[in-house]
Amino acid sequence: MRMKLVAVLALFAVCSMHAQDDLAQATIKGVLAGNQGQVVQLAEAFSEDQYDWRPAEGISSVGEALLHVAQANYYLALKMGFPPPEGVDMMELPKITGKDNIIAALKQSNSFVLGKVMMVQNDELAQEVDFGFAKMNKMGGLLAMMEHNGEHKGQLIAYARSNGVVPPWSK
């Protein structure tokens, strides 16, 4: 009995250590998924007509902001070594029109990057990457991905409130 207990405890310890191995990636994935989910909820709450609304000339419209998020997801993943899936042309994303098409493109990019977060290995987190706007390690790239989605969630909340749209999680 004592040997079984020791074996079970050893197995538990090994499993716990492995769970900690990807703690940073799992935490980032969780926060990123939450931000992405709320951005999609906001995207769905806007009417088709509101997708063309912009706070001022020269500022991104609702639809443009959503497509920017989708495009940036692919861009950041690409810089970390994960090219976009077959059939996705990053340069064509800004040309997508229509609420349903924009939401579909956003959801596809969200799913893609969530799948890639856990593929970044611990021994790669310190590797330097030139993102074009900054040089940082892959950990910084994962954090930038999470922060960027959160930044535009805030932008879209302001857009929603300006148009009388209540964020669905605030009701």
Question: Where does each model-flagged region fall?
Answer:
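Acidic/histidine-rich alpha-helical segments that form the ligand environment
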Residues: 95-129, 140-148
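Bacterial Sec-dependent N-terminal signal peptides
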Residues: 1-23
